[in-house]
């Protein structure tokens, strides 16, 4: 008996009316008319809010939620999320300015990322946001700039933990890493620092992202709390905050299922009891794609249909220049398909023959869907890529080959 092939998770986050996909109550044709564009990203803010509600339903209320702007820095989205989260995490001076202009209090904004340049460090100090220090030299530069500006820099140390997140889509801790300061080195230097030269906030322990295994995340949380307690114990000044990282993923590929936060939340409740000193601090989860990826779609028009030696290609006006991660060139080792649909033929039975969807670029890498079963496609149909609310336009080479940039809309 043949084993059934794995399938994508159900994309049930959007409404469908008469076979027409709805984003924020609008059909794709309506969105196209509103934008006067035939290829675009659309984000449904009710889906973002639903993801935030899922987080709060399961995670202890004492743990704050910050949005990592890098996942999607679309300004209308940032503004919409401002009242829904308790802080923003940024990775550049531009993102810092976006966060400030949203109205988020500066003390609820943190700046992480390796190789920060002097103008970025200076801007963060002047703005009064928390710098997540990634190296000893970066710390020295921040202190020196603070002295020159006569402003104490607000500093938290990003920790490169010795443990590593199992089954992580992107490992950002454990072993040698460009991120943070090795935990064993922090144990050496924290007792020796002159804390009068800066405002010490705490620690940022980030171990990975895009994980769909609650057992692995629970294990990482256990290690994170234990490490945070050790760091607090050897730091000769009070700790205010600990950023616990993120790590929570969303299902992109066949066989993947949505993460169950219930056991993760129950374990966190036990950890708060086990570590009463930590429970009194400001604890933060920093999430990006978990909050916004499910809320976004990428829609392009099918403008040509061709058959090459028996295989059908749906030719579209969109491609990897707009959506690099979907093409498999943003971290995948072996390309796998995102969930794909014909957006104006939702619910219709797929044809038996598999088809591929491609874009206009002169490279075989420009593949939107590879050998997938879809309803019978016609010219003018909408090809929709789900799970596209994170790492989309700003993570893609939009100037490659000179094609037009993609439009975005939040509804």
Predicted regions and their residues:
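Conserved, mostly hydrophobic/aromatic
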Residues: 48, 70, 92, 124, ...
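Flexible loop/turn segments at secondary-structure boundaries
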Residues: 73-76, 97, 164-165, 209-213, ...
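Active-site loop/helix belt of alpha/beta enzymes
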Residues: 2-9, 161-304, 400-403
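Charged (often Lys/Glu-rich) extended helix/loop segments that serve as interaction or gating elements
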Residues: 278-411
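Active-site-proximal loop/turn and secondary-structure-junction residues that shape catalytic pockets
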Residues: 47, 71-73, 94, 115-117, ...
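Structural preference for beta-strand elements that scaffold enzyme active sites
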Residues: 64-66, 87, 106-110, 130-132, ...
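A charged N-terminal "starter" segment
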Residues: 1-147, 151-152, 195, 199, ...
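Conserved active-site and cofactor/substrate-binding residues in soluble primary-metabolism enzymes
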Residues: 26, 43-46, 50, 72, ...
């Amino acid at each position: 008996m043949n084993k059934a092939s794995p399938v994508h998770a159900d994309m049930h986050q959007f409404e469908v009316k008469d076979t027409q996909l709805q984003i924020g109550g609008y059909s794709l044709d309506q969105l196209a008319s509103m934008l006067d564009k035939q290829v675009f990203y659309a984000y449904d803010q009710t889906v973002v809010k639903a993801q935030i509600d899922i987080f709060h339903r399961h995670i202890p209320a004492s743990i704050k939620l910050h949005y990592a702007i890098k996942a999607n820095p679309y300004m209308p989205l940032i503004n919409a999320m401002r009242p829904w989260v308790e802080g923003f995490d940024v990775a550049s001076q531009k993102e810092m300015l976006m966060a400030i202009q949203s109205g988020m209090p500066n003390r609820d904004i943190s700046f992480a990322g390796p190789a920060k340049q002097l103008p970025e460090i200076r801007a963060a100090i002047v703005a009064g946001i928390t710098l997540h220090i990634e190296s000893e030299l970066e710390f020295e530069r921040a202190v020196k700039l603070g002295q020159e500006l006569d402003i104490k820099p607000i500093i938290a140390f990003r920790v490169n933990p010795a443990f590593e997140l199992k089954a992580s889509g992107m490992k950002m801790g454990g072993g040698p890493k460009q991120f943070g300061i090795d935990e064993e080195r922090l144990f050496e230097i924290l007792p020796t620092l002159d804390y009068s030269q800066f405002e010490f906030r705490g620690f940022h322990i980030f171990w990975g992202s895009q994980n769909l295994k609650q057992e692995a995340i629970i294990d990482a949380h256990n290690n994170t709390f234990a490490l945070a307690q050790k760091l607090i114990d050897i730091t000769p000044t009070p700790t205010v905050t600990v950023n616990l990282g993120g790590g929570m993923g969303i299902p992109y590929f066949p066989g993947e299922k949505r993460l169950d936060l219930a056991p993760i939340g129950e374990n966190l409740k036990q950890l708060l009891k086990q570590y009463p000193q930590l429970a009194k601090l400001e604890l933060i989860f920093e999430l990006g794609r978990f909050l916004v990826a499910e809320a976004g779609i990428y829609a392009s028009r099918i403008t040509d249909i061709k058959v090459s030696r028996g295989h059908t290609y749906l030719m579209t006006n969109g491609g990897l220049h707009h959506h690099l991660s979907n093409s498999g060139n943003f971290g995948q080792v072996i390309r796998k398909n995102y969930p794909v649909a014909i957006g104006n033929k939702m619910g219709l039975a797929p044809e038996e023959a598999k088809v591929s969807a491609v874009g206009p670029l002169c490279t075989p890498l420009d593949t939107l869907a590879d050998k997938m079963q879809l309803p019978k496609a016609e010219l003018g149909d909408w090809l929709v890529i789900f799970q596209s609310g994170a790492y989309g336009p700003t993570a893609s080479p939009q100037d490659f080959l000179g094609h037009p940039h993609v439009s975005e809309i939040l509804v």
